[in-house]
A protein has these predicted regions:
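Short glycine-/acidic-enriched loop or helix-start segments at secondary-structure transitions
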Residues: 15-17, 56, 81-84, 100-101, ...
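Proline-aspartate-enriched helix->loop->beta-strand connector
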Residues: 67-72
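A C-terminal functional module that forms or caps the active site or interfaces directly
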Residues: 146-201
Length: 225
C-alpha cells in the first residue's frame, strides 16, 4: 500500500523521517517529499506548512503526484476537553472546521455542499489499541492558535464533543473527500488552553521534551496493515 503522511511543521517532520527506511527526498512544485518504507508499505511524508491553505495545497500535490491509497495527518494539537491531557493521542473519528460559516440557513463548520463531518478511516480506527492515553472523537480545525479558555468555550458551544483543535486536519480531510482518498488525523496533545495560565509556554515546554515515541503509534499502525 502507498501511504501519504502530512505534518505541518519542520520539527514534526524531524521526528517522523527517522521512522522511514531507505529514505530519499524528492522535490515537486517547491515542496519536498520524503520517500521511504514503513514495514512493507511505501510511504510519502511531507511538511505542508501551517494553516488550512498550506494543508490543502500539500494534500492535493501529494495526491496528484503520488496517488496514495491512504493519507494520514499527524503532528500536535491543542486539547479541547477536560478528559484530554498533554501527551495524549487524539484520533479523529470525525473532523470539522470550527471557523467556517457560510451564512444563514447553513450549518456552522460546514462548507456549503460538503459534509459537516469528515469521517476517519475505519480500518485504522479499528486497529487502535485500547489505552487510556488514546482518545477517539472529534478534531476541529481553524486558522488560529487557540491560546485562551474563552476560545475553547466558544468552540465547545458549537461542538460540545470536541477533543482537540488544530490548523490543518479539516482542510486535508476536505481535500481527501473531494479526491476520494481515505484519510485519518492522529494528533499528539501539546498544550491545553484553559488548563494552564500560559498554554503558549506549555506548548514550548512540550517541544523541549518532545519524546521520540511521539509518532510510535503511527508507526505501529502502518507496520500492522
Amino acid at each position: 500500500m502507498k501511504i501519504g503522511i502530512i505534518v505541518a511543521m519542520k520539527k514534526e517532520l524531524a521526528l517522523l523521517t527517522p521512522l522511514l527506511d531507505n529514505h530519499e527526498l524528492k522535490t515537486i512544485d517547491g515542496q519536498t517529499f520524503s520517500l521511504g518504507m514503513m514495514g512493507k508499505h511505501d510511504v510519502v511524508a511531507m511538511q505542508c506548512g501551517i494553516g488550512k491553505v498550506n494543508a490543502a495545497i500539500g494534500a492535493l500535490t501529494l495526491i496528484n503526484h503520488f496517488r496514495p491509497e491512504l493519507i494520514i495527518n499527524t503532528g500536535v494539537a491543542g486539547g479541547a476537553n477536560a478528559n484530554v491531557n498533554v501527551m495524549d493521542l487524539v484520533v479523529g473519528v470525525q473532523v470539522t472546521y470550527h471557523d467556517v460559516w457560510c451564512g444563514p440557513e447553513s450549518t456552522w463548520g460546514a462548507v456549503q455542499g460538503l459534509p459537516l463531518y469528515y469521517e476517519g478511516d475505519q480500518r485504522l480506527i479499528k486497529m487502535l489499541p485500547q489505552r487510556p492515553d488514546i482518545k477517539q472523537g472529534l478534531i476541529t480545525s481553524g486558522d488560529q492558535f487557540i491560546d485562551r479558555i474563552e476560545k475553547i468555550n466558544e468552540i465547545q458551544s458549537k461542538f460540545p464533543q470536541v477533543l482537540a483543535v488544530d490548523m490543518e486536519s479539516g482542510a486535508i480531510a476536505q481535500t481527501c473527500e473531494l479526491r476520494h482518498t481515505p484519510f485519518l488525523s492522529m494528533r499528539v496533545i501539546s498544550d491545553s488552553p484553559g488548563a494552564s495560565h500560559n498554554n503558549t509556554q506549555q506548548y514550548n515546554n512540550f517541544w523541549e521534551e518532545a519524546p521520540e515515541h511521539t509518532f510510535a503509534l503511527l508507526h505501529q499502525l502502518i507496520t500492522s496493515l
